[in-house]
């Protein structure tokens, strides 16, 4: 085809625009390459650590003497953790950030009497540890999964958390519609919340026992979702640890015909024996772990066979190295690893490196809200 003058000028304009856009991208890429080439790993030192609290997550950025930096995220770390981040930063300033396990153990062991076993401290430590892995990958010019020992897979399967947790009680039809939309969008697994705060059939806000009508509502909602998508889509249900043993057992048994992928946190995380009783009494797989911290926290659950699937949150349980330890511990008991994930895209990508690096990975949570 012969180009007309108008067509020539249009193509020329497009070419100039593309070149103009390519220049800054090329410059950025060159800057990254220069930083990597200039990296002297054995001489790296931590010079500063900064943090910000954005949309419910703590973000930590670690700086070095070579201009290389790393970012990490911690969830459920609360907004007033600035001073804790600075305290941890002061302890590792001047050290080589590539010694990730050593620095993690130094910070954890140095705060045993200050809450280093669980909760907010571990969530903050998680953000710091993840930032160290990010920094190490940049300094050595390799993906973090490579630093964790390499990958078992090239793709990470995710399920969609439908987030039907509203001020108004979702109907079974809304569950069905959400399930159908998720499948249409390409998901092969979906999750629904069953602990609906707006349910008028609750006994009261402090009662952990569900009323018969509340249990029936849960069954009706999930039955509608299953009917909408058929038998070949995985469906998960989350109770957020807000019920007691009798309710959990009743719900698990009532849901058996729906062939769920799992029932998540039907009771609070603390009582291992109660989880064992539920898991032994139903064919519905029982899953928990988002409120369990460090590999030590999962040891008892696995030793007693209290869970069918473990679900650590890699942005609060201790970080990527600790997450891999938890997965490998579960692998010894032939228990699948399905990480909880309510973090930002940064946390999601960090979790994906661990998911790639362990053999017993099942599926990762994905948020769209």
Show the residue positions of the predicted features.
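Shared catalytic-loop signature of beta/alpha-barrel
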Residues: 82-83, 90, 95, 102, ...
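Glycine-rich, aromatic-flanked loop segments that form ligand/cofactor-binding clefts
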Residues: 129-161, 165-167, 188
